[in-house]
C-alpha cells in the first residue's frame, strides 16, 4: 500500500548559484558523501545536485514532514541499486519518521524517479509499505 507521495520541481540555475556563492558549505550541508562524489564527477554538476535536491524535497513531502520535525537534508540521500535504479537511503530523523509510518509487519520500499531538462530538475517519490513474509 502507498503510504507517502511527494514531488518537487527546481530551477537548476538556483542550485548553480548556491554552489557558486557558498561552495562546499552548501554541498556539505545538504548532500551526503555519496551524493557529492557522484555529482562532482558529472559534467553538469549543477543539474546533478539539483536532481538530488529535488529528490530530498520530494522525499520529505512523502514522509509528511517537509524539512522539519527532526528530518534534515543529510538524513536523505539518493543512492543507486545494483541495477542502476535510483532510490532514497534514509538515516537519522528521516529513518525514524519512516519507521513510525509503517504498519506492523511491513517494510518500506521507496520508489524514486529523477530527471532534468534545463533549466528544470524534477523528482517524484512514492513510499510503499510491503508486508513482511512470515
Curated annotation (Swiss-Prot):
Signal sequence bounds: none
Keyword Membrane: no
Subcellular compartments: Cytoplasm
Keyword line: Cytoplasm, Fatty acid biosynthesis, Fatty acid metabolism, Lipid biosynthesis, Lipid metabolism, Magnesium, Metal-binding, Transferase
Gene3D superfamilies: 4'-phosphopantetheinyl transferase domain
Source taxon at top rank: Bacteria
Principal EC category: transferase
Residue numbers binding Mg(2+): 8, 57
Catalysed conversion reaction: apo-[ACP] + CoA = holo-[ACP] + adenosine 3',5'-bisphosphate + H(+)
Main location: cytoplasm
Necessary cofactors: Mg(2+)
Zinc among keywords: no
EC numbers on record: 2.7.8.7
Record's GO cellular component terms: cytoplasm
HAMAP family with a match to the protein in the record: AcpS
Function noted in UniProt: Transfers the 4'-phosphopantetheine moiety from coenzyme A to a Ser of acyl-carrier-protein.
NCBIfam families for the chain: acpS, pantethn_trn
Family recorded in the similarity comment: Belongs to the P-Pant transferase superfamily. AcpS family.
Name of the featured protein: Holo-[acyl-carrier-protein] synthase
Organism (species): Rhizobium rhizogenes (strain K84 / ATCC BAA-868) (Agrobacterium radiobacter)
